[in-house]
Amino acid sequence: MQNTIRIVGIDPGLRRTGWGIIETSGNSLRFVASGTVTSDGDMDLASRLCQLHDGLAEIVHSYKPDEAAVEQTFVNKDAVATLKLGQARGIAMLVPARAGLPVSEYAPNAVKKAVIGVGHGEKQQIHMMLKILMPKVEFKGNDAADALAIAICHAHNRGSNRMRQALAG
């Protein structure tokens, strides 16, 4: 009998950080919950990061995932925005790590490949595949959908991640 593993996927962002919780047992996936943690754009950066931290900490505390997956960020032309996104991503990695969860990271094209079969695709393709893979899925907005896709990517890759860690250790 396969163990059920609960995974939280996190799509970091300073304005909106998406989160999605799934359970995986063998090859089956089950939707648990999803949503978005927001920060107040009128507040200073430190306060906004605290809002993201507190919101994600509540999600991890409430849903008690076993593992976490966070999307890697990309560098864009706006260096200041990239740095702020990196800080939000730090919070997205810190919260589950402080809760004792192993945290894996995935590039955006790896997430798309795991969900839609190719490394480049549209948001609508991700939404459609989420509904096919988990018929009871519910998400409001792209951030929550992306977070669920990140969790699915981790579910597909977690065995190979464990193998790499064992070989490296």
From Swiss-Prot:
Reactions accelerated catalytically: Endonucleolytic cleavage at a junction such as a reciprocal single-stranded crossover between two homologous DNA duplexes (Holliday junction)
InterPro entries, per the entry: RNaseH-like_sf, RNaseH_sf, X-over_junc_endoDNase_Mg_BS, X-over_junc_endoDNase_RuvC
Protein's UniProt keywords contain rRNA processing: no
GO molecular function terms attached to this record: crossover junction DNA endonuclease activity; DNA binding; magnesium ion binding
A GO biological process held by the record: DNA recombination
Comment on bound cofactor: Binds 2 Mg(2+) ion per subunit.
Superkingdom of origin: Bacteria
Cofactor: Mg(2+)
EC number: 3.1.21.10
Keyword Nuclease annotated: yes
Subcellular location: Cytoplasm
Pfam families: RuvC
GO cellular component: a single term: Holliday junction resolvase complex
Protein purpose: The RuvA-RuvB-RuvC complex processes Holliday junction (HJ) DNA during genetic recombination and DNA repair. Endonuclease that resolves HJ intermediates. Cleaves cruciform DNA by making single-stranded nicks across the HJ at symmetrical positions within the homologous arms, yielding a 5'-phosphate and a 3'-hydroxyl group; requires a central core of homology in the junction. The consensus cleavage sequence is 5'-(A/T)TT(C/G)-3'. Cleavage occurs on the 3'-side of the TT dinucleotide at the point of strand exchange.
Subunit comment: Homodimer which binds Holliday junction (HJ) DNA. The HJ becomes 2-fold symmetrical on binding to RuvC with unstacked arms; it has a different conformation from HJ DNA in complex with RuvA. In the full resolvosome a probable DNA-RuvA(4)-RuvB(12)-RuvC(2) complex forms which resolves the HJ.
Family: Belongs to the RuvC family.
Protein name (database record): Crossover junction endodeoxyribonuclease RuvC
Organism this protein belongs to: Rhizobium johnstonii (strain DSM 114642 / LMG 32736 / 3841)
Gene coding for it: ruvC
